[in-house]
A protein has these predicted regions:
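Thiamine diphosphate
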Residues: 1-112, 117, 134, 153-154
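Conformationally flexible catalytic loops at phosphate/diphosphate-handling active centers
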Residues: 32, 36, 147-187
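Arginine residue identity/basic-tract feature
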Residues: 79, 94, 114, 142-144, ...
Length: 187
């Protein structure tokens, strides 16, 4: 769905950014018939700033992050939410590396973002992560409230499982063209 993916790979969300980059380099098109632009930044803060700028230009834009990366995105998240800009940040949730330097899955990172104004949508399996990513995208366009779509880092982000992929036609049916046009017109 998205036209721009601003990335700075951080474990356990690296796989999402790497796959987006791989698909773009292979010329795989989104539902609009375009190859999404993948912009790899020097930091998570840079990725969030790129998301903000791209959204302000009217592009459908996303990013993928986890733990400390999400913390560095918070200042831009306040701006994005305050401007009622549609966006989805996909977060492979894990503990923040503090005194214990833990990489175990928990929701410390996501809970630290509660006050940004982003809505939160959680997925508990690979299938749910696939399905809820689209629901978050469709809902952010309708509500003009940005979303954090999160799931357990490592347990879900690295799980290998068979899922039922949504077809481009199904995805297209979920995205309202008028809402996309309205998003673009606000730029």
């Amino acid at each position: 769905v998205n036209e721009v993916c601003a990335i700075y790979p951080i474990t356990p969300s690296s796989t999402m950014a790497e796959l987006a980059d791989e698909w773009a380099s292979k010329g795989i098109k989104n539902i609009w018939g375009n190859v999404p632009e993948i912009i790899e930044m020097q930091s998570e803060g840079g990725a969030a700033g790129t998301v903000h700028g791209s959204l302000q230009a009217g592009a459908l834009t996303t990013t993928f992050t986890a733990s400390q990366g999400l913390m560095l995105m918070l200042p831009n998240m306040y701006k994005i939410a305050g401007e009622l800009t549609s966006a989805v940040f996909h977060v492979a949730a894990r503990s923040l590396a503090a005194q214990a330097l833990s990489i175990f899955g928990d929701h410390q990172d996501v809970m630290a973002a509660r006050t940004t104004g982003f809505a939160m949508l959680s997925s508990a399996s690979v299938q749910e992560a696939h399905d809820m990513a689209l629901i978050a995208q469709a809902t952010t366009l309708r509500a003009r409230i940005p979303f954090i779509h999160f799931f357990d880092g490592f347990r879900t982000s690295h799980e290998v499982n068979k899922i039922n992929l949504l077809s481009d036609d199904q995805i297209r049916a979920m995205i309202d063209d008028e809402l996309v046009i309205a998003h673009r017109n606000r730029s």
